[in-house]
Amino acid sequence: MPWKYPHAMILAAGRGERLRPLTDHLPKPLIKIGDRCLIEHHLVALAQAGVDQVVINLAHLGDMIESHIGDGTRYGLSVVYSHEPEGALDTGGGIRQALRLITTDPFVVLNGDIWTDLQLDSLPDSIDGQGHLLLVDNPVHNPAGDFHLFGQKVLNQPVGNSVSLTFSGIGIYRHNLFNDSPRGRISLANLLRQAADGNQLSGQYFPGKWIDVGTADRLSEARRLAIRQNYSR
């Protein structure tokens, strides 16, 4: 049975500044975590969920990612690429440029530099607003969080018994979240905050394992968790 979101996007254009000098010669999505590199964990999970096509945006050392992944056949996917000038578009601009390659609405987006044990079929079958975010407990490096979750509503400010949480980098978006923005550099965070202000953003809390692999310490932690997960299978 086809999955509810047949098209997905993986964000893989970042420079990985905090992991230099490693990322001077290796793009962050190709860093190994366990038996696969970061981006391959996503590709395998997307294929298992029933995704047909994945768009990957590329900039820094993007040719290495494209050479490694190819057309996606070995993952059971069709993979296409959206090439960007390095540092030119930001996350929102990268998604905006790639919309021409994404013909389904809504669609799933995953940051290429996170590691998680999320089962993608736990995402909702449909969304009512412009976006839906997967939120996690606030890590040490982001103690104040990004948003507040009140029921299934994502808010910018606390209300009642709402909970402060961190955006995981995994979301479901409608095209109209981006369509009204001019082409070029666009902050995804700003678009999401605008959607939250307009009561157009829903979310869910994910209590499982999740790491933003942005520093050497977090990379080591992700590798430890991956080893532990393999032993527990």
For the regions a language model picked out, list residue spans one by one.
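Hydrophobic packing residues within well-ordered alpha-helices of enzyme cores
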Residues: 19, 65-69, 222
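Catalytic-core segments of class I nucleotidyltransferases/pyrophosphorylases
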Residues: 108, 115, 120-127, 138-141, ...
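Conserved N-terminal catalytic core of the sugar/cofactor nucleotidyltransferase
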Residues: 1-10, 32, 36-111, 180-183, ...
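A phosphate-binding catalytic loop at a beta-strand-loop-alpha-helix junction
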Residues: 5-22
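Short beta-strand-to-loop element that shapes/binds the nucleotide-sugar donor at the catalytic cleft/hinge
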Residues: 132-146
